[in-house]
Amino acid sequence: MDKRISIAIDGPAAAGKSTVAKVVAKKLSYVYIDTGAMYRTITYAALEQKVDIENEEQLMEVVKNVKIEFQQGENTQLVFLNGQDVSEVIRTPEVTNRVSIVAKHRLVREEMVRRQQELAEKGGVVMDGRDIGTHVLPDAEVKIFMLASVEERAERRHLENMNKGFDSNLEQLKEEIAQRDKLDSEREVSPLKKADDALELDTTSLSIEEVVQKIMGIVLGVFAK
């Protein structure tokens, strides 16, 4: 498997993208790039600095002074903000419920996309997000669009929150996920949408292993060409 391709995995909030992308990257010995974590890190930094996240100019001041780095931990990927490990704090509900607001700003997205493309320029990457196949890596050899029902995604996020010790309300999560879908799909810059050449994968009734197997089958098909 010497071929170093780019794999783009898109889909709505809590569709299981990052969980699956990490496993696929590990199987291929590829670099996993969690673009959602990049936007979460900006959101966290802005909240810490008490910046108005609706104000693009103020947000860009935050972005300019933020260095985001990824490091492979033992069983997970660690995210660093200016040298500080923020892997856990960027997953709190406070950040989760505001990240779509930060991500809707055109200048913020342009800068993040530039950084993401830089990370991916040599290939051998698995990148997940909302606009990877359509905007960040439009020439990716493999493009997957993962879907799951709002109910299923809320259940997954609820379990995730409980496991991390966060307060969690299932009905509230359903509302929040539906709201994030709306924000992500309706924003003017790089909205959430399936690339024309992406393969759609409904994961509602599939396990992580089954989704990974399906994606690996697609990747091996590309290698065989």
From Swiss-Prot:
Catalytic activity, as annotated: CMP + ATP = CDP + ADP; dCMP + ATP = dCDP + ADP
Keyword list, A-Z: ATP-binding, Cytoplasm, Kinase, Nucleotide-binding, Transferase
Annotated positions binding ATP: G11, P12, A13, A14, A15, G16, K17, S18, T19
EC numbers: 2.7.4.25
InterPro entries per record: Cytidylate_kin (IPR003136), Cytidylate_kinase_dom (IPR011994), P-loop_NTPase (IPR027417)
An annotated GO cellular component: cytosol
Record field: transmembrane: none
Localization in the cell: Cytoplasm
EC class (word): transferase
Record GO biological process: nucleobase-containing small molecule interconversion; pyrimidine nucleotide metabolic process
Primary residence: cytoplasm
GO molecular function: ATP binding; CMP kinase activity; dCMP kinase activity
Family indicated by similarity: Belongs to the cytidylate kinase family. Type 1 subfamily.
HAMAP family listed in its UniProt record: Cytidyl_kinase_type1
PANTHER family: CYTIDYLATE KINASE, CYTIDYLATE KINASE/PANTOATE-BETA-ALANINE LIGASE
Protein name (record): Cytidylate kinase
